Amino acid sequence: MSFNSIKFLIVFIFIFVTNTSQSNEIPNLEGTWIGKNNTLSNQRGFRTWEKKVEILEQKDRRFKGTFSYTDGTKDFFGIIHPDNVTFTWVAANSRGYNIGKILEKNRISACYVESGIDATAGCADLTRK
C-alpha cells in the first residue's frame, strides 16, 4: 500500500468516526421557539399566525413544554426519535399530534395533524430565541 493510500485511509476513518460520534449526540431542544405557522382546516380555512413553543425541560430524548395558539396555551410532552432529527409531541387535551424535524441547531419544523370533525393540518418553521 502506498503512503498516499494510507493517508487517504486515515483521513477517511477520522471523518467517519467524527461524523458517527456527532450523530449519536442527543440534541438539546430546550428554549423558546418562535415562527410562522401555516394551517388549513374546514372551519378556519387557510391561516398564517405566529406560534410560540417553549421547551421547558429535557432529560435525554424526553422533553416537555408549552405552546401558545389562538385558543390559549397547552402543555405537551414529547420524544426525540433515535435518528436525532425527528421528534413527536402530544398534548393531553388534544386529538392530534405534532411531528417535527431539527433543521439546524436553532431551527426546527413542527407540523400538526388532526383527523375527524376538526381535521387540521399545519406546519411551523421555528427559530430558537
Predicted regions and their residues:
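Bacterial N-terminal signal peptides that target proteins for export
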Residues: 1-9
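Hydrophobic helical h-region of N-terminal Sec-dependent signal peptides
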Residues: 10-15
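Boundary at the C-terminal end of the N-terminal hydrophobic targeting segment
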Residues: 21-25
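Beta-sheet ligand-binding and adhesion/scaffold domains
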Residues: 27-52, 76-129
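N-terminal, post-signal-peptide region of Sec/Tat-exported proteins
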Residues: 47-74
